[in-house]
Each structure stands twice: as structure tokens, then as C-alpha cells.
Amino acid sequence: MNYFPWLTIIVVFPIFAGSLIFFLPHKGNRVIRWYTICICILELLLTTYAFCYHFQSDDPLIQLVEDYKWIDFFDFHWRLGIDGLSIGPILLTGFITTLATLAAWPVTRDSRLFHFLMLAMYSGQIGLFSSRDLLLFFIMWELELIPVYLLLAMWGGKKRLYSATKFILYTAGGSVFLLMGVLGVALYGSNEPTLNFETSVNQSYPVVLEIIFYIGFFIAFAVKSPIIPLHTWLPDTHGEAHYSTCMLLAGILLKMGAYGLIRINMELLPHAHSIFSPWLMIIGTIQIIYAASTSLGQRNLKKRIAYSSVSHMGFIIIGISSLTDTGLNGALLQIISHGFIGAALFFLAGTTYDRIRLVYLDEMGGIAIPMPKMFTMFSSFSMASLALPGMSGFVAELIVFFGIITGQKYLLMPKLLITFVMAIGIILTPIYSLSMPRQMFYGYKLFNAPKDSFFDSGPRELFLSISIFLPVIGIGIYPDFVLSLAVDKVEVILSNFFYR
């Protein structure tokens, strides 16, 4: 048993160190940037060290457990712990946040507040992935909203207030259902409120009550994931946010919804999940086709990438609802894979906008010759997005396919039908993925854009793009690096469906 509070330090350090930013000089942008990037690197190294030396990947139980009494009156505890399910998203959070702070170097207006909000998000995300208490999970879930709202409303585009308001209305509305679900689970069947995850996992509920809890949690996670028809905040938010904020949104924020579906809906409410899983499968299949088709009709580059994110989330939903260890492992791999690819595409879209000041694809064209490095990286990540063999997206989608085909819960004809419709979605993906670089980089040169702004990627942008590209290739060639972390935990989760 390791008694050193590793997880508490990892959760609290970014927001505590971030609050010291306000003591730095107001106009010292360079100092603020380096301070923030050093905090992020130190946090990532600390997390990696703690996991390498104190985490056993073959143990499906909760590790690095910490339990401190926080508020005596409510019997509220600060409970943290990690398992194979949460270690991947935590490392992804550290990696993407570090690169997002590097991407945010051009931000000079109110840079102290900007970097503090990014570090506050960092703490909230790691706190969410490592919390073992339902109320703490809810608090960390809410801690995300205010930084994202401010990052949108203060550093967004022309319609930033509209998109920020839409974001807060959708996510706060979902949070109401999450709070109701948390309180319902906590207050059921005992005089003392039970907020501990371990106690709740072993609790059994009447079927009707479990279904009500399931629907409440599902709505909250469906908004964040997002699952259609609760997805309309996402394209507006991505269309207006600064690209460093988009990296955090696409790379981590959307994954919180998928993580919640697995951690709470699957693990705590297995009976209701087995009832709803066929409907989830249908929703996921429709989502792949709908979002891919809608993405094709988008003129705005960032909105097109946003709809591609919605389409890729469809594979995660199908993997979660397949009720097989293969399908769930595929969903977890897709969570990590799309975290890298989505963040990279938004970063490249944002840096391209910085140069040519155009957002609509039909106004772009002919910039491959003056910007060959940008062209190479954007084309590579577009290929990764369409699941090219050898890249992480291909392995993830293939494993989800195998998960459906090998599933025992569904009859042969529904499985074949869903596989066929998913295959249509995979055919649509290259159409919108490849039309982006075609419209941006090929064709006639722009005569209305100033020539002096056509400079190629600098060392910072190249370093950032390659840093994301290496894991995409690495996971594509050797996916067991990610799968080995969660495979034992996945078996434990799925055993609930067959032995409970």
C-alpha cells in the first residue's frame, strides 16, 4: 500500500500553481508562457512517474487509493483512485494540455487569465478521471464549465457570446440531470448517503428506478459526448473558440462524456445498460451517417472538423453498447485515438486561419506551394481521421467492428445490418476528410489574400504537429500499448452483465 498522496498532488498542483500566475508581471507574456508550459511539463512528468512506479497494469482493482474526510457534516470524502479505465484519459489529458499551452503562445490579451483557465481545466479533468466519489465526480464535472465558458466568451470569434451562452445552457442543463442522478444513487436504500463508487457498484436497484437513474446520467453524458440530437452546441463552440481551446475541447472534454458512460452507466447500472444497449447501438449508427453527411455540407473548416468529431464519437457509442470486451476495448482505443487526431486537426485549422484569415473552404485554395509543411501535416492527419491502416483510428474502428460481430447479445441479422450501415459511414468519411485538404491546398491561388502572410509552419508548430503524429502512428502500429492498460478492467466491468 502506497500512502504518499500522489493523486491529490497531481489533481491540485495545476490549479494551485496556476493561481500564482496573477503575481507575475501583467505585461510579461514571455514569462507567463514559460511558467505555464513548465507547470504542464512538470505535471506530466509527475503523472508519468507515479503511474510507472506505483501502478500495476495487470491489477483490475483501484490503485493509488486516497480517502480523506472533507466535510464532516455531509460525510463527504475526498476519494481518489485510478484503474485501467482512467489511466489512459489522464495521460491523454496531460499530453494534450501541455501541447495546447504551447499552441496558445500567440495569445497576448489577458494572457495571465487565459493560462490560469487552462490550468484550472487541467485540474478539473484529471480530478474527474481519478475521482472515486460521486459528488466529487460532479464537482469536477462542473469545474470544467466556467473556464471553458470564459475561454469562449473572451477569446473567441465574432459570435463568441452566442456560442458561449449556447455551450453553458446545454452543459449546465445536462449537469442538472447528473446532479439528480448522483443524489438519487446516494440517497437510495440507506439512512446515510453513500457516495462511494465501490459501495454503489455493489448496490442493486429495482429495475424501474435503475432505468430512471440511467436516463438521468445518460442525458448528462450525451450532451458532453455529444450524442445526437444534443450535439448542436459543438459546431458553434468549435467554430468560434481559439484553436488552443478547441484542442482541449476535442481532445479531452468530449472524452469526459464517453468516460462517464462507461464509468457510471455501465459499471454502476449494468441491468439498465443491457436494456438500453440496442437503442444506443442504433443511435451510434445513425450518428456516424448523419454527422458524416452533415460534415460534407459545411463551408466553415472548423465546423466540418467538429462534425467529423461527432461522427467518430458514434464508434465509441457502438463499442460501449456492444457488451463485448473487444467492442469496449475498441471504444477506449477510439477515445485515445480521436483525442490526438481531433486536437491536431483543430490546431492545424487554427494556424492556417492565422495566416490566410479565411474560414470558409470555398474561399481557400492553392496554398500547398507556399506552405508545404502545413500541407503535409494537414494531409497526414486527414488520413489518420479517415482511419488509414497503420494509424490509430484504423485499429480502433476495426476492433469496434469485431466487437459487434463477435457479440452474443444480438442476433445475426441486426449485427449484419449495423455493420453494413457503419461501413457506409466509413465510405463517407474519406469524402469529407479528403475534400478539406483538396479545397484548402489545391486549386487556384487566392488573389485577395496578402502574399506576405503566406509563411510556412515555424519550429513551434512543427514540433507540436509531430508530437501528436508520433503517438497516432505508434498506437496504429502497436495498439497493445493502450489496450494492455484497460483489458483486465474491461473484463471486470463486463462480468457484471453476466453474473449479476
Curated annotation (Swiss-Prot):
Membrane topology recorded in Swiss-Prot or TrEMBL: Multi-pass membrane protein
Family the entry assigns: Belongs to the complex I subunit 4 family.
EC code(s) of this entry: 7.1.1.-
Compartments, as annotated in UniProt: Plastid, Chloroplast thylakoid membrane
Organism in which the protein naturally occurs: Solanum lycopersicum (Tomato)
Main location: plastid
Protein name per Swiss-Prot or TrEMBL: NAD(P)H-quinone oxidoreductase chain 4, chloroplastic
UniProt keyword annotation of Thylakoid present: yes
GO-annotated molecular function: NADH dehydrogenase (ubiquinone) activity; ubiquinone binding
Cysteines engaged in disulfide bonds, as pairs: none
Keywords carried by this UniProt record: Chloroplast, Membrane, NAD, NADP, Plastid, Plastoquinone, Quinone, Thylakoid, Translocase, Transmembrane, Transmembrane helix
Catalytically driven reaction(s): a plastoquinone + NADH + (n+1) H(+)(in) = a plastoquinol + NAD(+) + n H(+)(out); a plastoquinone + NADPH + (n+1) H(+)(in) = a plastoquinol + NADP(+) + n H(+)(out)
Protein's UniProt keywords contain NAD: yes
One term under GO cellular component: chloroplast thylakoid membrane
Biological process according to GO: aerobic respiration; ATP synthesis coupled electron transport; electron transport coupled proton transport
Gene (UniProt): ndhD
Transmembrane segments: 4-24, 35-55, 87-107, 113-130, 134-154, 167-187, 208-228, 242-262, 272-292, 305-325, 330-350, 386-406, 416-436, 462-482
